[in-house]
Amino acid sequence: MDTKLYIDGQWVNSSSGKTVDKYSPVTGQVIGRFEAATRDDVDRAIDAAEDAFWAWNDLGSVERSKIIYRAKELIEKNRAELENIIMEENGKPVKEAKEEVDGVIDQIQYYAEWARKLNGEVVEGTSSHRKIFQYKVPYGIVVALTPWNFPAGMVARKLAPALLTGNTVVLKPSSDTPGSAEWIVRKFVEAGVPKGVLNFITGRGSEIGDYIVEHKKVNLITMTGSTATGQRIMQKASANMAKLILELGGKAPFMVWKDADMDNALKTLLWAKYWNAGQSCIAAERLYVHEDIYDTFMSRFVELSRKLALGDPKNADMGPLINKGALQATSEIVEEAKESGAKILFGGSQPSLSGPYRNGYFFLPTIIGNADQKSKIFQEEIFAPVIGARKISSVEEMYDLANDSKYGLASYLFTKDPNIIFEASERIRFGELYVNMPGPEASQGYHTGFRMTGQAGEGSKYGISEYLKLKNIYVDYSGKPLHINTVRDDLFQ
C-alpha cells in the first residue's frame, strides 16, 4: 500500500526521495510506504493552490458541485476498494469500514446539495438609495489535517465543504493512515478537479507540521486531532491570523438514569465505547449509572463486553489500537488505575490471539470500577476500549460529574423522564447531547464542542459557513453629490 504526493496536477515522489514504512495495526507488519514530503514539497503544493484559486472561485458553486457529486459517484461505485484500505491500514472490522464509507458518501452528497443555497443578504443603508450587499466568499488556501481514527470520513468532511465553497486545498493525512486519503483524492481528481485545486502531502508531522500551519500563504486550517496538537497549531498559526477549525479531544460522559431502557442503553454503550476500539472523540469514556440499577447494569455490561470478538477484521466486533505507542499508553493508564485502588471489572490487558494477529495492537475491552473522579481514568482522554464507572444518586450529582471535565464534545443520556431530558439539555455543557440514542447523527448535525474540545465546528449549514468569509459591499446609487460632514463642500466650488 504505497502512496504518492499529488502536487499541481501530478503524482510525484518526495523531493528528498525518502519514504516511511506504514505498519498494520492488525498484524504489526509493514504493509506499505508513504512519501516523506519536504518543505520544498509543501511550498510547491501551496503555490499550486494559490495559482489555481481564482479560476476555481470563478467556476461557481453549481459547477463545482457537479465535480464533487461525480467524485461521490466514483467513490460509491468503487467503495469496496476503500473499505479494504480502511481495514488494512486502520484495522477496523468490516462492519465499521462499511459504515465509514457510508458516511463518506453521505457527507459528500450533502455538501454538494448546498450549491444553490450559498446565499447572502442585501441590507438597507442609511437612506433608500444606499444598500449593503453582504455575501460570502472563500477564504482562499485551506490546509486540511486529517486524523487516523476515521481516515476516510474526516477527509470527506473537510474536502467537500472546502471545495464546494471555492477554496483550494492542501490535504495532509495522518502518517498512520495515508492510503484512505490518497484513494479519495484520486477519485476527486478522476471526477475533474482541476490541477492545483487539490494537493496531497504526506510526511511526519514532526518534520513538516509546523511549517505547513505557519505558512504565510495559508488562509484557513482545519484539523481534527488531539488538544495538544490543536494548541500548538493555534500558536503557530497566530502570526498569520489564519482562520482555524479545530475539532480536538473529548471525554464523553455516558449517563444512565434509573428509569432508562436498559437494553437500549447497553446496546448504545457497546457502540459508544468499543466503536473503533474507543478511538473516537465522541467515545464514551466515563460511565455514570444510578445506584438503584448500578449492579445489574454493570453485570450485564461486563458479560456483553466479554463476548466481543477480536482479531480478523472480517469477523471481529472490535479492532486494534492504531500503533505500539497507543498500546503502551493504554497499558500504563490501566496499571496506574490499579495502583490507585481502582478495580478492574473486566479486561485490563492484551488478549491472547493466534496466527497473524498475535502481534497486532489489540487491547481487551476494559471496565474499571471504584476509580476516583479526579484520576486519569475520569479526567484524561484515553482513546482506547477502556471506561471508568461510578454510581450516581441524584440528577445534580450527575450533572456535576458530567461537567467535571476540561473537554466538552459529546455526551450521552438515557432516561424516560422528559423533565430530566430538557433540564440536561441546559445543564450539560457539551456541544452534543445524545438522548436515548447513539451518535453521530447525520451530516446535517453541527459537530462542535465546549472548552478544550476546540473551536468552530463541522457539518450542517454552520459547518459550511466556517469555510466562507462574510464580505460587505456598500453602494450609493443615487448619482447625487455626496455630502460628508468632515469635508467642506466649498472646496469643490
Swiss-Prot record:
One function term, GO molecular function aspect: glyceraldehyde dehydrogenase (NADP+) activity
GO annotation (BP), single: Entner-Doudoroff pathway through 6-phosphogluconate
Annotated positions for site Transition state stabilizer: 149
Record: residues binding substrate: 149, 157, 281
GO CC annotation, single: cytosol
Active site: 247 (proton acceptor), 281 (proton donor)
Name of one Pfam family that matches: Aldedh
Coiled-coil segments on the chain, per record: 70-92
Coiled coil among keywords: yes
E.C. number(s) listed in UniProt: 1.2.1.89
InterPro entries reported for this sequence: Ald_DH/histidinol_DH, Ald_DH_C, Ald_DH_CS_CYS, Ald_DH_CS_GLU, Ald_DH_N, Aldehyde_DH_dom, Aldehyde_DH_Superfamily, NADP-Glyceraldehyde_DH
Keywords assigned: Coiled coil, NADP, Oxidoreductase
Pathway(s) annotated for this protein in UniProt: Carbohydrate degradation; glycolysis
Record field: pH dependence: Optimum pH is 7.6-8.
Residues annotated to bind NADP(+): 146-149, 157, 172-176, 204-210, 225-248, 281, 381-383
Family (UniProt): Belongs to the aldehyde dehydrogenase family. Glyceraldehyde dehydrogenase subfamily.
Binding partners and assembly: Homotetramer. Dimer of dimers.
Protein known as: D-glyceraldehyde dehydrogenase (NADP(+))
The species this protein was found in: Thermoplasma acidophilum (strain ATCC 25905 / DSM 1728 / JCM 9062 / NBRC 15155 / AMRC-C165)
